[in-house]
């Protein structure tokens, strides 16, 4: 349902506060030691205050919302008659008054948990009903101006309650230092009645609605947000809102530059002196001996400054990974770690796992390896990526490009093209193992076995496969593809079982499949067993074929799903008929004509001298890179013109002005491409570095 205009949405703001309170008491309930009397009583007092606020909230709703709605609609009655708030308050009072010892506390705790769980199950849907049912009715029976006036009164009533500030403090503060300080202050210097009355009716910044606070926080930089998060629990939760952390620049932040806007003007290369300083920092940090004697020389002082900067960067990265990204990672669009002195492959792997919606990733001149991309382990896990800069990452090999290509996803148009091919070339193959007989297609039917159904459900002689496998139901189990000429040792499968392998797939060479794309060299695929990429999640046949020399061969795949229950194994499975009139496999959404994968616009592998033609051809899988405009392969010494041609043919939007590769390669667009950018470069690989 589309959200209602903010000015007339009378439920969302108060309900946000109420839902926060529900989350807080659930968290406290799980952390309370019921054997400890102090913890037990503190929890009950907190719950009592929370439910008093719930009671106040519903009284305001009854008077200013439900009551007015009942006057105009006869269908509304007894909205808050069965919410059990009074019963819960009585339960808390009983616990505070009557429970005396540890045995009674533990018995009471069991009852308390059951009652709270039951209340929460009813209370949250009740709020949802108000937002989805009563709000539209309000829009129907009241004018826009009337609703604006109602919302103002509701917010004012929530803010004017005497106990609101105290409830906020009681629910937000876990340490008792502030409470002791307040007690001491007011016991020594009591305020006059007049001052107390004024303070009760004053409205401070803590009473502002959450949406207003978020608007204020949006003007703060990351350092200021971190300071605000220490003010109170409420502010701590607000500062962890994803919209405040869309763009991350940890390397700049560690050096005092707290910019956190979009990545504009960051693509220009720094001068060599700046790069040298970053390298010196990295070297000093890695060579630093914590137990070494202190050297007071000028050179040592400069080195200690470099070490302290790198240490600051490392602490900042750890803080982001453990304290910020678990909450806001899905909202992060930009991550710039260029020239980082402290970042490691493990850190990058953790960050990428927490940030699946990245659009701009800059890892220029970092000391990462292929393992940094291990978290990109399934098809389309980072399909929003538009800018990827790996310039100067000398440890990057083809393995990383395999993971990157898989993470970019697969084009919808590419999927549909292969579905048409598959329906015309379906052949049946029988795999018999004792009493189990299975049938699959030569190319694509094996993916049906990746659903959660058991063998007994999938193999039914009377009910052929008719339901397409959509991407929404796909659970991405592991799929192991083996070369039929070089099968794995049985000991290897033990390790796979520990890695939660759910399916096993055997690949056989088939010669009757020809790629539909022109210019294919029809070479066989070799070494699939040794490829790390294909030993991960393999979710699409279109990802295994393309119109280039790397993959113009067919495969017949035979799949055995995870072991079913014993009863299923005892039954003899009948051969399964495959309907040819319908699509057997479906990858993608019918609802959108716009591509959601492989939208990369910028790719720089400058100085990645270990990249080969294999890595370039991997990028053509799944539909190529149709939107790529900028491609920098300067310093990639081992690639050839054939590999470049294969990649360029899969990049129809490539701009020759931003296409860079070694001058010694006789490749595509030789007259219009921009050549090598690394000539006489002091910090990037180049075949002419010594000149």
Curated annotation (Swiss-Prot):
Any one GO CC term of the record: nucleus
Region of interest (Hemerythrin-like), residue spans: 1-159
Predominant cellular place of this UniProt entry's protein: cytoplasm
Domain F-box: 202-248
Pathway: Protein modification; protein ubiquitination
Domain of life of the native organism: Eukaryota
Compartment(s): Cytoplasm, Perinuclear region; Nucleus
Sections of the chain in a coiled coil: none
Gene Ontology process terms (BP): intracellular iron ion homeostasis; protein ubiquitination; SCF-dependent proteasomal ubiquitin-dependent protein catabolic process
Cofactor(s), by name: [2Fe-2S] cluster
LRR repeats mapped onto the chain: 340-364, 365-392, 393-418, 479-508, 576-607, 608-635, 636-661
InterPro entries recorded: F-box-like_dom_sf (IPR036047), F-box_dom (IPR001810), Hemerythrin-like (IPR012312), Hr_FBXL5 (IPR045808), Leu-rich_rpt (IPR001611), Leu-rich_rpt_Cys-con_subtyp (IPR006553), LRR_dom_sf (IPR032675)
Binding site for Fe(3+) 2: 58, 61, 80, 126, 130
Regulation of catalytic or functional activity: An iron-sulfur cluster promotes IRP2 polyubiquitination and degradation in response to both iron and oxygen concentrations.
GO MF term list: iron ion binding; iron-sulfur cluster binding
Post-translational modifications: Polybiquitinated upon iron and oxygen depletion, leading to its degradation by the proteasome. Ubiquitination is regulated by the hemerythrin-like region that acts as an oxygen and iron sensor. Undergoes constitutive ubiquitin-dependent degradation at the steady state by HERC2.
Pfam families assigned to the protein according to its UniProt record, in alphabetical order: F-box-like, Hemerythrin, LRR_6
SMART domains listed in its UniProt record: FBOX (SM00256), LRR_CC (SM00367)
Positions with a binding annotation for Fe(3+) 1: 15, 57, 61, 130
Free-text domain note: The hemerythrin-like region acts as an oxygen and iron sensor by binding oxygen through a diiron metal-center. In absence of oxygen and iron, the protein is ubiquitinated and degraded.
Subunit structure: Part of a SCF (SKP1-cullin-F-box) protein ligase complex. Interacts with ACO1/IRP1, IREB2/IRP2; the interaction depends on the [2Fe-2S] cluster. Interacts with DCTN1/p150-glued.
Protein name stated in the entry: F-box/LRR-repeat protein 5
Source organism (scientific name): Pongo abelii (Sumatran orangutan)
